[in-house]
């Protein structure tokens, strides 16, 4: 028997088909990008970067109350349902140590490693759970874009941003004295080289073009800056470095997490986690449509210590 593929999380707001009339009402500019797909349903051309950007703007406004959202040209335009799923799966992880209740409110702090120009995880996490976020990045242009989004939506008290000054580090040197986080999030660079990233982008274009054999494939990549799409050594090197650096913050973070796109990277990641001395490890499968991924989570606190962490936070609320 073939196992069922993971579907969207039950709390994900993006179940079923998109409600285009509601989206267009929230953001009328979407109307000029709306087309009828081969099944006779309203859609957009997902190979058109501007259409995807306007579509995201409409989704964020209609579903999350985010009034202002934009990103610079050639920066990654995230698929929002998949990003939301990561937030919900991470919320369930916190709930497991909290008598099954998802902790909500500004007492919960999350760190988004690689917040990007789109600032998507802090926006979704704060909207759904009222968590406070710190977003880090090595790219000053991305941080400036994220800051503009935060300020335009009056979220300065909920979302703060910080540059990782040393491009060779991920966590090291980033956190300030005494900072504690319930959760870290990370969507690491997927590819190991620019050429690999370009080939991956071309595959995406070809997949999108299957419905329209007349589509001309562009020469440039699918969207995303170099540091968003690839790093030396790829996903496996980035995540294993993140694990190594997490050890120095073992007492100050309840759960570290990262997405892992390539299942073939899991054995190396699990070996790094064993070496790190993590006391709890979770690998949770996720999936949206044809895309399969998983969240890897690790903690240096045992069961009793994690429950005590939540109890302490509640007592300080």
Curated annotation (Swiss-Prot):
Gene3D superfamilies: Vaccinia Virus protein VP39
Top-level taxonomic group: Bacteria
Keyword terms, alphabetized: Cytoplasm, Methyltransferase, rRNA processing, S-adenosyl-L-methionine, Transferase
Keyword flag Metal-binding: no
EC numbers on record: 2.1.1.181
BP term (GO), one: rRNA base methylation
Molecular function via GO: 23S rRNA (adenine(1618)-N(6))-methyltransferase activity
Catalytic activity: adenosine(1618) in 23S rRNA + S-adenosyl-L-methionine = N(6)-methyladenosine(1618) in 23S rRNA + S-adenosyl-L-homocysteine + H(+)
InterPro entries, per database record: METTL16/RlmF, rRNA_lsu_MeTfrase_F, SAM-dependent_MTases_sf
Chief localisation class: cytoplasm
Location of the protein in the cell: Cytoplasm
GO terms under cellular component: cytoplasm
Family the entry assigns: Belongs to the methyltransferase superfamily. METTL16/RlmF family.
Summary of the function given for this chain in its UniProt record: Specifically methylates the adenine in position 1618 of 23S rRNA.
Record-linked HAMAP family: 23SrRNA_methyltr_F
Protein name: Ribosomal RNA large subunit methyltransferase F
Gene name for this UniProt entry: rlmF
């Amino acid at each position: 028997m073939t196992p069922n593929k993971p579907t969207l999380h039950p709390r994900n707001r993006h179940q079923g088909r998109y409600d285009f009339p509601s989206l267009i009402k929230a953001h009328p500019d979407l109307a000029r990008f709306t087309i009828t797909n081969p099944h006779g349903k309203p859609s957009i051309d997902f190979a058109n970067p501007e259409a995807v950007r306007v579509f995201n703007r409409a989704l964020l406004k209609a579903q999350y109350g985010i009034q202002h959202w934009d990103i610079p040209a050639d920066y990654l335009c995230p698929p929002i349902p998949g990003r939301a799923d990561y937030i919900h799966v991470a919320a369930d992880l916190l709930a497991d140590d909290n008598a099954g209740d998802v902790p909500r409110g500004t007492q919960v702090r999350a760190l988004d490693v690689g917040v990007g120009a789109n600032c998507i995880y802090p926006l979704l996490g704060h909207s759904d759970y009222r968590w406070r976020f710190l977003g880090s990045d090595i790219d000053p242009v991305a941080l400036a874009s994220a800051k503009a989004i935060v300020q335009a939506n009056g979220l300065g008290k909920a979302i703060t941003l910080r540059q990782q000054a040393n491009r060779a580090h991920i966590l090291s040197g980033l956190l300030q004295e005494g900072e504690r986080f319930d959760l870290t999030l990370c969507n690491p660079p997927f590819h190991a080289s620019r050429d690999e990233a370009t080939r991956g982008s071309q595959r995406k274009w070809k997949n999108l073009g299957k419905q329209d054999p007349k589509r001309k494939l562009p020469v440039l990549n699918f969207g995303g800056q170099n540091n968003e799409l690839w790093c030396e050594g790829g996903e496996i090197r980035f995540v294993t470095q993140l694990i190594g650096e997490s050890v120095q913050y073992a007492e100050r973070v309840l759960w570290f997490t990262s997405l892992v796109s390539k299942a073939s990277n899991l054995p190396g990641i699990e070996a790094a986690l064993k070496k790190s001395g993590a006391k709890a490890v979770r690998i949770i499968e996720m999936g949206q449509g044809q895309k399969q991924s998983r969240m890897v989570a690790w903690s240096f606190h045992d069961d009793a210590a994690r429950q005590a962490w939540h109890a302490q936070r509640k007592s300080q609320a």
